[in-house]
């Protein structure tokens, strides 16, 4: 959709931060909370660069020389403002912001990789201003207003002589040297069914986070995590996103026009994210942002009805018709703490089309996250009830007590962990530079690096780390290949 967040400085040093603020015994033993091994200040130049690659729109809340009005007061200091001004806010998010402000909270426009003016990024890619067409969410942008890897990067580098993409190539495994200390390349399958070995001095694991874990496990890279002994690292600390929300229905005086939407259009508060609020007596770690967003009013997908409406029939049709123009949605986008019992491994029975064991996911919501979601959802519901012209509200919590995680209802695609970064090889797959402890010429990218998941969408943090890794690979490793940290 284009939500583009930076992590809070405390997010990247979570264990150290909570122990320093609340004491060494505050974090329970059933949570694998870890520091990332890299700080906000180290990543800030890379966050800034990536925001410029995407033509990000927003309002800065904290600059290096002090706070700014209208932005997120809890964010880390920025070296530069967003490259584009914030998006224009529709009725629903505006009313949410007004109610939040009256309650003493700090609303600001959602940071968006949706351009708000003509823009040329550092690679020379041109973006156009968003038209609020309502077909951004779950789709590409035909108007070139939403940041996209093809638009923002690929089109600018595809003609480089030292760049090539092998299309229709399925990587089957990473090959290792005889002593197992380095990778020698990858073996992939062509669309003609031919196995090809591609030698490489450096192997970058650039698949989606889950598939990086799978490829490592089937290739024998690193040490697989064993939940019984709690040893090994590949597949450890799998985490997700903890979602809740509130539906808000207005009287006929408020017309929200939901069909005028964009991927990352909305107003947010960060007052209950991370450790932006006192956790002393709450019984949980983490938090989440609360946002009122307006992405689309597509009739097959968007059918808001008040609580108690029948699921079908004439009364359902009447409720859809009467409420289509008078509805807003609040989202609680919560963190997800890693636990010893949530992990990824190879399935002992099922195999894929290439004869490899499938990846198996073992996950349920930790009690910590259930309590967090219930608390922050209560704050969202409080704001909803204080919005003007509201006739009814209804809340939902995917992590409610008594409900197990289900992969069936869409929540997010924010799968994290399994290839965690850090400074301790017994609890991380890669070091602080994204380099594998066990195979120094293998570098790993993506949200699999997160030791636990934040209350934000993962794109901004993972790309900040990606540019940090590339910087050290290019300027430190290539000239002298070696482990960049001692194990």
Task: Set out the residue ranges of the language-model regions.
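Short, glycine/acidic-rich hinge or "gate" loops at secondary-structure transitions
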Residues: 57-78, 390-402, 479-487
């Amino acid at each position: 959709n284009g939500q583009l967040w930076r992590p809070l400085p405390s997010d990247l040093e979570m264990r150290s931060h909570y122990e320093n603020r609340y004491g060494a015994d505050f974090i329970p033993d059933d949570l694998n909370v870890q520091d990332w091994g890299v700080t906000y200040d180290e990543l800030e130049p890379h966050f800034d660069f990536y925001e410029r690659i995407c033509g990000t729109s927003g309002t800065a809340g904290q600059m290096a020389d002090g706070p700014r009005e209208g932005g997120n007061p809890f964010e880390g200091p920025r070296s530069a403002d967003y490259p584009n001004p914030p998006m224009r806010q529709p009725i629903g998010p505006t009313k949410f912001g007004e109610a939040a402000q009256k309650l003493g909270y700090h609303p600001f426009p959602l940071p968006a990789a949706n351009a708000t003016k003509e823009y040329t990024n550092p690679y020379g890619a041109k973006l156009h201003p968003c038209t609020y067409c309502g077909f951004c969410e779950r789709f590409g942008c035909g108007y070139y207003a939403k940041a996209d890897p093809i638009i923002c990067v690929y089109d600018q580098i595809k003609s480089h002589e030292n760049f090539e993409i092998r299309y229709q190539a399925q990587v089957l495994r990473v090959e290792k040297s005889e002593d197992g200390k380095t990778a020698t390349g990858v073996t992939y399958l062509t669309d003609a069914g031919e196995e090809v070995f591609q030698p490489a001095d450096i192997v970058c694991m650039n698949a989606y986070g889950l598939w990086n874990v799978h490829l490592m496990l089937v290739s024998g890279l690193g040490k697989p995590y064993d939940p019984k002994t709690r040893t090994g690292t590949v597949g450890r600390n799998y985490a997700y996103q903890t979602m809740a929300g509130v539906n808000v229905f207005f009287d006929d005086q408020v017309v929200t026009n939901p069909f005028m939407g964009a991927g990352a259009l909305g107003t947010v508060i960060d007052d209950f994210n991370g450790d932006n609020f006192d956790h002393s007596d709450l019984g949980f770690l983490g938090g989440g942002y609360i946002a009122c967003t307006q992405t689309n009013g597509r009739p097959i997908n968007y059918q808001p009805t008040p609580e108690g409406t029948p699921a079908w029939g004439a009364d359902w049709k009447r409720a859809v018709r009467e409420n289509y123009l008078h509805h807003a949605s609040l989202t609680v986008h919560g963190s997800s703490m890693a636990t010893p019992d949530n992990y990824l491994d190879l399935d002992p029975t099922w195999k894929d089309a290439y004869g490899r064991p499938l990846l198996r996911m073992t996950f349920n919501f930790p009690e910590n996250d259930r309590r967090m979601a219930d608390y922050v959802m209560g704050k969202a519901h409080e704001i909803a009830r204080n919005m003007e012209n509201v006739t009814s509200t209804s809340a939902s919590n995917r992590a409610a007590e008594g409900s197990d995680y289900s992969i069936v209802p869409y929540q997010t695609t924010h799968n994290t962990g399994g290839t965690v970064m850090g400074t301790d090889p017994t609890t991380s797959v890669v070091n602080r530079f994204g380099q594998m402890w066990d195979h120094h010429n293998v570098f790993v990218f993506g949200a699999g690096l997160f030791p636990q998941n934040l209350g934000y969408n993962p794109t901004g943090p993972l790309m900040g780390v990606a540019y940090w890794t590339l910087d050290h690979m290019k300027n430190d490793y290539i000239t002298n290949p070696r482990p960049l940290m001692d194990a």
